[in-house]
């Protein structure tokens, strides 16, 4: 009787294995590290695809100097070519931010389902906190040392 059950089980496993057998449809597998490196270093898309906007809005020299001063970077004695690069990059960033503000959003979506963690969790009482702390064990994988927070 037991042998018959194992035979039936083996047949089911073999059928399921054959039925769900899969193969690689993505492409040939990598053989050398160079192939992996070449694949990872090849560009598939560029940020400029998504940031090609009208560059009519220019940033003034005063704005560039204020931002450099606020950021703690040197703001005096900067070459004109460097200042021009900073202005162009800042202008592109501001245009991109303005484009983001122009995107229409669906405000009818319930925000409480947009996070993994609940937004309004049930508050814990003091006794529940103490009980959970008492039952918590130190995890050496996370670098927690037993007795490090306990009073001597």
Curated annotation (Swiss-Prot):
Record has ATP-binding as a keyword: yes
Disulfide bonds: none
Localization (cell): Mitochondrion inner membrane
Assigned EC number: 6.3.5.-
Any single Gene Ontology cellular-component annotation: glutamyl-tRNA(Gln) amidotransferase complex
Coiled coil: none
Role according to the record: Allows the formation of correctly charged Gln-tRNA(Gln) through the transamidation of misacylated Glu-tRNA(Gln) in the mitochondria. The reaction takes place in the presence of glutamine and ATP through an activated gamma-phospho-Glu-tRNA(Gln). Required for proper protein synthesis within the mitochondrion.
Protein name per its UniProtKB record: Glutamyl-tRNA(Gln) amidotransferase subunit F, mitochondrial
């Amino acid at each position: 009787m037991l042998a018959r059950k194992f035979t039936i089980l083996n047949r089911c496993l073999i059928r399921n294995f054959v039925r769900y057998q899969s193969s690689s449809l993505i492409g040939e597998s990598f053989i050398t590290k160079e192939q992996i490196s070449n694949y990872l270093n090849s560009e598939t898309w560029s940020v400029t695809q998504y940031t090609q906007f009208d560059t009519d809005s220019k940033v003034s020299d005063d704005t560039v100097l204020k931002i450099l001063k606020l950021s703690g970077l040197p703001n005096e004695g900067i070459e004109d070519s460097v200042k021009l690069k900073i202005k162009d990059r800042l202008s592109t960033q501001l245009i991109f931010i303005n484009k983001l503000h122009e995107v229409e959003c669906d405000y009818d979506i319930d925000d409480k389902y947009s996070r993994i963690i609940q937004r309004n969790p049930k508050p814990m009482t003091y006794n529940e906190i103490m009980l959970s702390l008492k039952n918590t064990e130190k995890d050496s994988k996370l670098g927690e040392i037993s007795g490090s927070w306990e009073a001597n």
